[in-house]
Amino acid sequence: MTTNDTWFTEHFQTTGSAIGFRVTGKLDEVQSPFQKIEIYNSTDWGKLMVIDGALMLTSRDNFLYHEMISHPALFTHTAPKCVVIIGGGDCGTLREVLKHPDIEQVTQCDIDEQVTRMAEKHFPELCTSNNDPRATLLFSDGVAYMADCPTNSVDVIIVDSTDPVGPAKGLFNRTFYESCFRALKNDGLLIQQSESPLALLELIKEMRHEMSKAGFKAFKTLPFPQPCYPTGWWSVTLSSKQPNANFAFRQTDAQTKPFDTLYYNAHLHHGVLVPPPFIAHALGE
């Protein structure tokens, strides 16, 4: 990462590329016990949240990520009631999950309370569901939380984490996935952010391999645009305990959903289930 008076620029060694945003200044900064969190104001993308030098979200395009990490799983499950979010400290995913009126309980567990406090201060539009009576916000280690989670108690687990380094590294291995597998009901689903399919397909393959070793039987990686992330293209990976899962979704419910979205809809969901040939070939689909 480099900054000067007018630009925030992030360099990506894994992709040999960089992305920059014109900024008017730094609005806030806090060093938590886990990471450094900064907030910048940009000229065209609203506010930026940066963690340890890596851009996490912008006001302008965060809806893409938050909608795609939540609604595909919730409309694929036949009747989700109990949801766990691991990570998700900016609370945008929590907001999207609680748009579903039949959700009864959401527990969000993020290791760093300061991420949520900075989001509440600078991105209040993401935090509108923080006081929903169905929501419980915990600030502790997500790996430990899932290890202690009761067996067969959760319908959908959403892993809304940073990249697989630092505090989030433990969210990408077999031990964590075994905890998720045990906590999910038989028809439960796991969905996790899975980086750029254009640049990091090997990481996605390794994730799916670790999930498979933990017992998951079927997988579907869903790509979507994300301009502020490396390559401008991101993905989430959906996993099922059922060997014959085809990830059919409740299309009528998605078409008649009683809430607004900016990106997700039933037609898009149908299309994203058909991967581009290069992804299908690499992942053996």
UniProtKB/Swiss-Prot annotation:
Its main location: cytoplasm. The keyword Cell division does not apply. Keywords: Cytoplasm, Polyamine biosynthesis, Spermidine biosynthesis, Transferase. Its EC number is 2.5.1.16. Pathway: Amine and polyamine biosynthesis; spermidine biosynthesis; spermidine from putrescine: step 1/1. One of its GO terms (molecular function) is spermidine synthase activity. Residues 5-241 form the PABS domain. HAMAP family: Spermidine_synth (MF_00198). Belongs to the spermidine/spermine synthase family. This is Polyamine aminopropyltransferase. The lineage of its organism: Bacteria, Pseudomonadati, Pseudomonadota, Gammaproteobacteria, Lysobacterales.
